[in-house]
Amino acid sequence: MQGAWVLLLLGFRLQLSLSVIPVEEENPAFWTQKAADALNVAKKLQPIQTSAKNLIIFLGDGMGVATVTATRILKGQLEGNLGPETPLAMDHFPYMALSKTYSVDRQVPDSASTATAYLCGVKTNYKTIGVSAAARFDQCNTTFGNEVLSVMYRAKKAGKSVGVGDHTRVQHASPAGTYVHTVTSNWYGDADMPALPLQEGCKDIATQLISNMDINVILGGGRKYMFPAGTPDPEYPNDVNETGTRLDGKNLVQEWLSKHQGSQYVWNRQELIQKSLDPSVTYLMGLFEPVDTKFEIQRDPLMDPSLKDMTEAALHVLSRNPKGFYLFVEGGRIDRGHHLGTAYLALTEAVMFDSAIERASLQASEQDTLTIVTADHSHVFSFGGYTLRGTSIFGLAPLNALDGKPYTSILYGNGPGYVGTGERPNVTDAESHDPSYQQQAAVPVKSETTVGKDVAIFARGPQAHLLHGVQEQNYIAHVMAFAGCLEPYTDCGLAPPADENRPTTPVQNSTTTTTTTTTTTTTTTTTRVQNSASSLGPATAPLAWHYWPRR
């Protein structure tokens, strides 16, 4: 897969070495008509005031507004366009808001505390998941009595099917927010936990994945946390570093299978496609790597499913429930690419994330499905330098810096791309387009950091209009619960969707092919060429919203 991405990027780098200006854009009538068309659409926009049968939330981990914009440019350039004018799938969603991402104890949050906010409706502390702010990081005994419930849990309680699909490990902080209660977000398996919290009764995240609630679809990475220590990995049987890690000797996959009729476990793309299309399958677990799934450019399309594949498979299985479903999908490797200071990895992941959103939009009706796209936090990622229209998103600014050397449009505020030699290194256009290139950073840190900026929320479907203005991040969970008439909003007073009894007929499964093709859309325009150097959420929710029932 990496070769295909490289060829595409080389192609548009050569094509876009000169800035191009569409001649029609020089005419004011072009922009007047464009605005008039958008205005006509806006005037006809009517909120869908029914309840939502289905609930989908797409989480772009670390996908701040700058990342969204850069992804839009990359997508457009991969399609042969100039870039910024090309819409993303999420751009077509009619409602938008901003989300305040701070956690209770941190101005700049992490993926754990934010997941608790947008999935459980309660803000909490740094590195804790599924617990209130009364719990303390790394203090096991503060977990009990401070657990909070997710919207997914409430959807399951209401009779819906539920699922998670992720491009990281399924025990990662973001998907874990749908099912776990932990004061330490990296307790992936029991081997990752100290002795004391185990003695005090705290459970690792993998154990809670199969025991806290009844999840119909689980797709992502994280195999090694599910099997006894030393168990050979099916994909890498001779690699001792990829064997199972569980010290309690449990086979959690087998335990999960034994609980459910109609359940299947898969570990590669072909099996995923086959089982998801089997109408007898109502429970599907797919774990495709020992830890995190591969970056999109490194993915083997014959062995490893894309996030779009996982989304489509999940929707096939979940849609078999006439009462509807709840689905969480995360583009988790966007975040990892940014932490590495490697924008190429982050943005190519974001392009695939957007394709998963597009696939879900084709499979799920806007009339009965509330779909939300958002991010947990942003990153110290930016792009600038007055680059000319059509310049590769990975390219150089048109003018050199004060030291006489070129610099990339994309830069990081901190990260591993800092070079402390006393002299900023030169960077060439070829280097800046290398998939492994780490953009220069102002401050040296081992892993680039998140930021405290607001992030965008995109929404469509029933009650999507409630996502407006600037909101606290936990408001997202309350909108989803209200739209689905789930606790604590079971008396929502909303009529059912008009087509609630319509059988779900997903589009033809696009993952049945074993080769990957890229469709290129070319927009023909007349151009001129320029030379280029290269909080309205409830103040207090009912008690049932906040606390997990003791067992």
UniProtKB/Swiss-Prot annotation:
Positions of the pro-segment in this chain: 532-551
Cofactor: binding comment: Binds 1 Mg(2+) ion.
Record-linked InterPro entries: Alkaline_phosphatase, Alkaline_phosphatase_AS, Alkaline_phosphatase_core_sf
Protein topology in the membrane: Lipid-anchor; GPI-anchor
Residues that hold Zn(2+) 2 according to the record: D335, H339
Taxonomic superkingdom: Eukaryota
GO MF assignments: alkaline phosphatase activity; metal ion binding
Cofactor: Mg(2+); Zn(2+); Ca(2+)
Biased composition (Low complexity): 511-527
Region (Disordered): 496-537
Subcellular location field: Cell membrane
UniProt binding sites for Mg(2+): D61, S174, E330
Protein name: Intestinal-type alkaline phosphatase 2
Lineage: Eukaryota, Metazoa, Chordata, Craniata, Vertebrata
